[in-house]
Amino acid sequence: YGEFYERPIDDEELIREGEKIAQQIIERLRMRPELEDVPILIGLFKQEARNSIVPGSYLQYAVSSPGKNSLGDWVQLKEKYVSFPMSSPEDIYRDINDAFNKFKHEIDLYFSNITSVIGTGFYKENRIQKLEVEIPIQFFGTAEIIGFTQYLTGVMLSKLPQDLPVVISITSMNGPEALIKKMPNEDEPFVHIYE
């Protein structure tokens, strides 16, 4: 409720200020008797903009050993969520973006009433770890949902990378309609149609 204010903060400033605040948090937590002799882990998380489809990402973390009032060395995390399709992807996202665009194009060819196919990729150490796809639909009957789900399963197997975990959620105004889940190098995905 009320106004929301946000401004972009570059990673360097976020890390510098986050490390200062983390140290203050450790000092405050250690004042509590029940937290004097336990390890405490603190992570720095970068929140994406309010209108972003993807969540934020952890940038780094550090541990305060039991009984210590300071943090150990910070460990960098090279993790990032990205959304697909991208209009001008960086090199590390290009292959998945191309595959995703082919996947989306196949859906658009046969189901032109689908307005959006939204993908979220999770990258770690600049390598994709998983792909989640959300497809809101406006079909009216169970038979249409079953047919669309079967079609999607085939398109997923032919257009998306085989060595990648992929989860496709089909939703409507009524909630979840179907789920397709494929683990790396599986020939047959798990398919569930909600009743």
Language model features with spans:
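Acidic/histidine-rich, surface-exposed loop or edge segments in extracytoplasmic proteins
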Residues: 1-10, 77-89, 129-136
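Short edge beta-strands and adjacent turn/loop segments
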Residues: 1, 111-137
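Short, non-transmembrane amphipathic alpha-helical segments
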Residues: 8-34, 143-165
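Extended, H/D-rich, highly charged conserved domains that either
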Residues: 28-39, 52-54
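A short amphipathic beta-strand at an alpha->beta junction
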Residues: 33-47, 159-182
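C-terminal region signature
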Residues: 180-195
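Short amphipathic alpha-helix segments
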Residues: 101-113
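Aromatic/basic-lined ligand-recognition segments
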Residues: 46-95, 101
